[in-house]
Amino acid sequence: MGMWVGRGRWGRVWHDEPQHSLLMSVIVRPGMSVADQPKLSLATAVAVAEAVGLTTGLNVKLKWPNDVLVDGRKLAGILLESRVVAKPIVIVGIGVNLRQRTFPHALAATATSVDLEGGRAAGREELLEVVLDAFDRWRTRLENEGFAPLRARWLALADTIGRAVTVGEHAGVAVDLADDGALVLRQACGLQHVVAGEVIESRRG
């Protein structure tokens, strides 16, 4: 569960000192359509946020679509990759910063860890068990109950909603999560649904 670097979204690396992070991958054969599989990313984010909050006592929030934040800084990240072998699979990669006290200069203003935030010192094995339990629960609910329960829980944890943001070429105030998992922006010309991209916050809307 420890490595020097992992791979994050947009080809970035996940920096780690050995034993200082929980880095894990879960192989899933989704019981849902290919079109619905991006919602698994949101389910993973909710599961990680709940697990971290439960084990550390920290006030954890979500940045669309799946960054896990504490006080606006990234504590955990998620990457999903699809593969087609005999049957389609999804590899769910999760990285949670636990014991880091410092980060590289490029990350110092945006990254954090459980230790830096003063959270309870959860062990990696303990957190792994709680993450897997929460992930299995939310994946099962998504497959059996549809998106509505997950959407409600994601919105309850969302840090992005209400903020003025830029996502790619789109700028506006994030106001909702659509039924397909897209981020809904309020712009001068109306509502814009954004399905992919990195959220860059500008100010509170």
PLM region descriptions:
Residues 38, 42-59, 70-205:
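Long, positively charged amphipathic alpha-helical accessory segments at protein N-termini or as interdomain linkers
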